[in-house]
Amino acid sequence: MKALWAVLLVTLLTGCLAEGEPEVADELAWQSNQPWEQALNRFWDYLRWVQTLSDQVQEELQSSQVTQELTVLMEDTMTEVKAYKKELEEQLGPVAEETRARLAKEVQAAQARLGADMEDLRNRLGQYRNEVHTMLGQSSEEIRARLSTHLRKMRKRLMRDAEDLQKRLAVYKSGAREGAERGVSAIRERLGPLVEQGRQRTANLGAGAAQPLRDRAQALGDRIRGRLEEVGNQARDRLEEVREHMEEVRSKMEEQTQQIRLQAEIFQARLKGWFEPLLEDMQRQWANLVEKIQASVATNPITSTPMPEEN
């Protein structure tokens, strides 16, 4: 395992020189001490190494080693996410049941999206291994190019899923902090003077009446914001698919043009191979004919016939 991480480190250093700022941005976005984010960092590192499609990656993709490593990293990440979510649930405290259910549902949905896309990535790598083994009328370069395109697309999707989950957990954590603060305030009220207790009780009654309205407004705002984010993500995915389709069409056209050019060159070479011997044979025959005529003239010179005299 240490050797694998050493290879990953060298690959990452090489990738940073080649890809520049986008990789640095990914690293900066995940500087955190939460265990689930650290597990996700390990998943990112391994995915970056797979994306290099180096000779070692190609060799390990032929076996089940890559998918096994991804499975372990995926399970570690999702286990840490579940543990962190459970920890926040225990800290959530006395919040409205509607708010608790909404926050839990949002976190669960974001967690499910991340897990499903990780599973899709693992299945795609398994499909690549099968395609390489069968090679059904395709070249290895075509299969590798298609895998590289799919990995880039999946990496973007996974990054969006991870960012969305991070936001949802941050909201969940904020609710837990508010619940803890309310618990501390309740203890302070019970230990305070009786007059202060009455004043705080009156203030809490007013806040309790306004709380459902605030919860409904927040829920509506969250639903609208979530819908806008979903529409934006769908639009970005569609644009990305169109761009990738255009790139595939352009690549296929270039490949077909190259094939036509090669076929024309082959046909030209065949024509040349057919006609050159024929021309050479005709030239030899013509030269032989000329030589025979010249030889005949030399051995049988033409004598001039005298003209008859006129009377």
From Swiss-Prot:
Chain segments carrying region LDL and other lipoprotein receptors binding: 150-160
InterPro entries in the cross-refs: ApoA_E, Apolipoprotein_A1/A4/E
Any one GO cellular component localisation term in the record: very-low-density lipoprotein particle
Subcellular location: Secreted; Secreted, Extracellular space; Secreted, Extracellular space, Extracellular matrix; Extracellular vesicle
Disulphide bond pairs: none
Mapped Sequence repeat ranges: 72-93, 94-115, 116-137, 138-159, 160-181, 182-203, 204-225, 226-247
Region of interest (8 X 22 AA approximate tandem repeats), ranges: 72-247
Alphabetically ordered keywords of this record: Chylomicron, Endosome, Extracellular matrix, Glycoprotein, HDL, Heparin-binding, Lipid transport, Lipid-binding, Oxidation, Phosphoprotein, Repeat, Secreted, Signal, Transport, VLDL
Residue ranges of the region described as Specificity for association with VLDL: 270-282
Positions of modified residues (Methionine sulfoxide): 135
GO biological process: acylglycerol homeostasis; cholesterol efflux; cholesterol metabolic process; lipoprotein metabolic process; melanosome organization; phospholipid efflux
Domain of life of the organism encoding this protein: Eukaryota
GO molecular function (one): phospholipid binding
One Pfam short name: Apolipoprotein
Region (Lipid-binding and lipoprotein association): 202-282
Signal peptide segment: 1-18
Region feature (Homooligomerization): 258-311
Residues the entry annotates as binding heparin: 154-157, 221-228
Modified residues (Phosphoserine): 139
Gene3D superfamilies (alphabetical): Apolipoprotein (1.20.120.20)
Coiled coil feature spans: none
PTM field: APOE exists as multiple glycosylated and sialylated glycoforms within cells and in plasma. The extent of glycosylation and sialylation are tissue and context specific. Glycated in plasma VLDL.
Subunit structure: Homotetramer. May interact with ABCA1; functionally associated with ABCA1 in the biogenesis of HDLs. May interact with APP/A4 amyloid-beta peptide; the interaction is extremely stable in vitro but its physiological significance is unclear. May interact with MAPT. May interact with MAP2. In the cerebrospinal fluid, interacts with secreted SORL1. Interacts with PMEL; this allows the loading of PMEL luminal fragment on ILVs to induce fibril nucleation.
Family the entry assigns: Belongs to the apolipoprotein A1/A4/E family.
Protein task: APOE is an apolipoprotein, a protein associating with lipid particles, that mainly functions in lipoprotein-mediated lipid transport between organs via the plasma and interstitial fluids. APOE is a core component of plasma lipoproteins and is involved in their production, conversion and clearance. Apolipoproteins are amphipathic molecules that interact both with lipids of the lipoprotein particle core and the aqueous environment of the plasma.
UniProt-recorded name of the protein: Apolipoprotein E
Organism: Mastomys coucha
